[in-house]
Amino acid sequence: MEKKVALVMGAGDNLGSAISKCFANDGYTVVAARRNGEKLSPLKDDIESKGGVFYGYSLDARKEDDVVKFIKEIEANIGAIEVAIYNIGGNIKFGITETTSQKYYKTWEMATFGAFLTGREVAKHMIKRKSGTIIFTGATASVRGGDGYSAFSGAKHAKRYLAQSMARELGPQGIHVAHVVIDGAIDTPWIKELFNDFYNEKKGIDGLMNPNDIANNYLWLHKQPRNAWTHEIDLRPWIEKW
C-alpha cells in the first residue's frame, strides 16, 4: 500500500508536535523538520512507540536550496507528500523605533518566505497528482495589527494572503490550501513559566487552547471532501474577546 506522507515544517514541542502525533495516529508517515532536528527525538520516540512511522530532519526553512532538496528527497525516498503543514513563525514584540531591519527581515523570513518556499515546492509535486493539502498556521496578527507587533503582523498578514492566492490558483487543480488563525494563547510550558498568574486563571476555566484539539482541526481540514472545502478557520477559546 502506498504511504500517506504528512510533512510538518516547524515541529516544535507544542503545536507542531501535536499535529505530527495527530497525523501519525491516523496512519500517516510523518516527516517533521525543525531548525535543530536533535530536539525531535522525544517526538520520534512517542510516535514510534505507538507503531507510527516518523522521519525527523534538521532544516532551516528560510534556505531555498535546502528546502528544494529536502522536498525532492522526501518525494523520491519516502513517499508522495499528501499534506504539508507550515507551522513556523517568530512572534516578537518591539516598538516601531526599536524594530531593526534585521528583526523585521528575520521575522518575515520565518513566517512568510519559508511558507512561500515550502508551498511552492510541495505544489510542484501535488499539481502532477492533482491532489494534496497545504495548511499554513496563522495568528491573531494575521488579521489585525497590534501595538508593538509591526514585524510579526506584517509577516503574518503576508502569509495569509500568500495562502489565499495559492488557494485561488491551486484549488481548481485539485489542491486544498487552507489557513488557520490561532486567536488565543496555547497551553504550553512557555506560557506557564512566563505568565504564571495568567496561565492558572485561564487554565482553570478552559481558557487556554489545547494543542491536541487544535491539531484535530488540521486533520479535519485535510479530510474535507472537495465539494465542501474550507479555506480559512479561526480557532479561539470560548472566553477570548474578538
Predicted regions: what they are:
Residues 119-120, 164:
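A short, exposed helix-loop element centered on a Lys and neighboring polar residues
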